Amino acid sequence: MKLSFHGQSTIYFEGNGKKVIVDPFISGNDKCDLDEQTLDVDYIILTHGHADHFGDVVELANRNHATVIGSAELQGYLSTYHGVEDVHGMNIGGKAKFDFGSVKYVQAFHSSSFTHEDGIPVYLGMPMGLILEVEGKTIYHMGDTGLFSDMKLIAERHPVDVCFVPIGDNFTMGIDDASYAINEFVKPKISVPVHYNTFPLIEQDPQQFKDAVHEGEVQILEPGESVSF
């Protein structure tokens, strides 16, 4: 199986012949190598509603007639205000099966809203992490989160093959907490650092994260590069 990284927290993969993207922050993201006007997807999965994760979901969903998976509140917002027709609302602890595999939402410590042009934020449900089971593999996309001890419980319940872990600090875990999460709680086979170097406030050296991790393998990906396992 192959998972490709496209800047910030955007991940693309194919499962059982279906094309899936997570947190499609494409336009307005100089670190992303994708083109939202030509990208072909069947499913879009969202961890929360912040602009650097919500991204181009409306354009992609409406042009591709793709199914959008996310919090119930976020799905209601997309269908009511943006005409997105195929939405699947979920919440923390819930699991659902799709053509490509299954999605289970787990806890994340963060916030979730979308700010309109008038500057007023709209509450879009709880922020969440993802447990994806695809073609016999388990992927943990942490979303945006601080460190919390139940990461250990999540990994005990779902032994992780690949973990996408935010390291940018300021808004999420930094390198110290992210490496602790991997070494002490999650212990995946492969870790991939995400959510860094997109903006000045989250500039980090991913090599420092790699040097601090002693559980499993760390793969540092440039936008467009993939991890295969």
Swiss-Prot record:
Cystine residue pairs: none
InterPro entries: Metallo-B-lactamas (IPR001279), RibonucZ/Hydroxyglut_hydro (IPR036866), UPF0173 (IPR022877), UPF0173_UPF0282_UlaG_hydrolase (IPR050114)
Lineage: superkingdom: Bacteria
Keyword Hydrolase: yes
Xref: SMART domains: Lactamase_B
Keyword match Hydrolase: yes
Single GO term (MF): hydrolase activity
UniProt keyword annotations, A-Z: Hydrolase
Family: Belongs to the UPF0173 family.
Name this polypeptide is given: UPF0173 metal-dependent hydrolase SH1218
Organism for this UniProt entry: Staphylococcus haemolyticus (strain JCSC1435)
